[in-house]
């Protein structure tokens, strides 16, 4: 599918942001940074050099330009028409990890699994659950990411964020307002760093727990397919996959998108699906689940951009 290009904003932004150190790219393809491998371009992709560069950009970016943040692209559908405005992706300047006693400080661009490994290597228990989340720390902060009995709220001490005006904030655990797959932090906050606290433990036991999580994921989830991870949040008192299965949606196909046969809360790109097919399949699943069980499933996957 050919997506029309957006107007090129880079020359105007470069003029408005003369001290910018990060990279601006016009009409940047971003499908390949998502796990589904679908979607149109970012009107402008900005990869900030570090937190100060991000704050500078946001402080001087014209207010009428919308801002969207993406991480590793694991829990994300980019629609086929692309994403207008500025898409921010945190790269190398946000990938440091430091361990000090029982404390781990990690940039928002660090994959969750790397934090789990750093904790295990340091003999710190309580963060192994991050091994089961296929995303980055920024996403875990935004949605209280969790898996295998643990959630971000269980280990977080504090977080750093930059708001749309370029102001830097330090948020305590209470400030984050965590609930199931949700943070009450303002929507315009872009997380840049997290500080976690672990509990001293035995390295071998922690590593064994991580291996159990890895084995469980491989046995029960289609992790080798083009998928976005868990599609729907678990409604109170229910498991989303059970509701999807009971609605007869296991293996359901729309175009080149499919509900996984292995785990019904996963959607799969069979090879050359469009974002519209994947999202449309998810909506059909929601319709059937509502019809059969009376439960309205809420998307866990983030969907951004415009239809083609």
Curated annotation (Swiss-Prot):
The keyword Glycoprotein does not apply. Residues 216-233 have a biased composition (Polar residues). Keywords: Cell cycle, Cell division, Cell shape, Cell wall biogenesis/degradation, Cytoplasm, FAD, Flavoprotein, NADP, Oxidoreductase, Peptidoglycan synthesis. Residues 37-201 form the FAD-binding PCMH-type domain. The active site is at 181, 230 (proton donor), 300. GO terms for molecular function: FAD binding; UDP-N-acetylmuramate dehydrogenase activity. It is found in: Cytoplasm. Its cofactor is FAD. GO terms for biological process: cell division; cell wall organization; peptidoglycan biosynthetic process; regulation of cell shape. It catalyses: UDP-N-acetyl-alpha-D-muramate + NADP(+) = UDP-N-acetyl-3-O-(1-carboxyvinyl)-alpha-D-glucosamine + NADPH + H(+). Pfam families: FAD_binding_4, MurB_C. Its EC number is 1.3.1.98. The keyword DNA-binding does not apply. Pathway: Cell wall biogenesis; peptidoglycan biosynthesis. GO terms for cellular component: cytosol. InterPro entries: FAD-bd_PCMH (IPR016166), FAD-bd_PCMH-like_sf (IPR036318), FAD-bd_PCMH_sub1 (IPR016167), FAD-bd_PCMH_sub2 (IPR016169), MurB (IPR003170), MurB_C (IPR011601), MurB_C_sf (IPR036635), Oxid_FAD_bind_N (IPR006094). Belongs to the MurB family. Cell wall formation. This is UDP-N-acetylenolpyruvoylglucosamine reductase.
């Amino acid at each position: 599918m050919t997506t029309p290009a957006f107007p090129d904003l880079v020359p105007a932004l470069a003029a408005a942001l003369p001290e910018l150190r990060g990279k601006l790219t016009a009409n940047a393809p971003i499908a390949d940074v998502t796990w589904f491998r679908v979607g149109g371009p970012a009107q402008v992709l900005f990869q900030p050099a570090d937190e100060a560069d991000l704050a500078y950009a946001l402080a001087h970016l014209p207010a009428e330009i919308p801002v969207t943040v993406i991480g590793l692209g694991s829990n994300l559908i980019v629609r086929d028409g692309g994403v207008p405005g500025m898409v921010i992706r945190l790269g190398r300047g946000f990938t440091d990890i430091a361990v000090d006693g029982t404390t781990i400080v990690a940039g928002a661009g660090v994959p969750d699994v790397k934090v789990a490994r750093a904790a295990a290597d340091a003999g710190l228990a309580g963060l192994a659950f991050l091994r089961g989340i296929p995303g980055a720390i920024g996403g875990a902060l935004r949605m209280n990411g969790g898996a295998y009995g643990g959630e971000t709220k269980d280990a977080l001490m504090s977080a750093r964020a930059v708001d749309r005006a370029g102001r830097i904030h330090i948020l305590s655990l209470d400030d984050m307002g965590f609930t199931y797959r949700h943070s009450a932090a303002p929507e315009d906050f872009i997380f840049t760093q997290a500080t976690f606290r672990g509990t001293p433990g035995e390295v071998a036991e922690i590593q064994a727990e991580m291996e159990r999580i890895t084995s469980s994921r491989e046995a029960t989830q289609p992790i080798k397919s083009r998928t976005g991870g868990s599609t729907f949040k678990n409604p109170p008192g229910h498991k989303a996959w059970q509701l999807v299965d009971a609605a007869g949606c296991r293996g359901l196909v729309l175009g080149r998108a499919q509900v996984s046969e292995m785990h019904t809360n996963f959607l799969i790109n069979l090879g050359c699906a469009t974002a519209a097919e994947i999202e449309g399949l998810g909506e059909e699943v929601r319709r059937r689940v509502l019809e059969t069980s009376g439960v309205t499933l809420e998307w866990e996957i983030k969907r951004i951009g415009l239809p083609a």
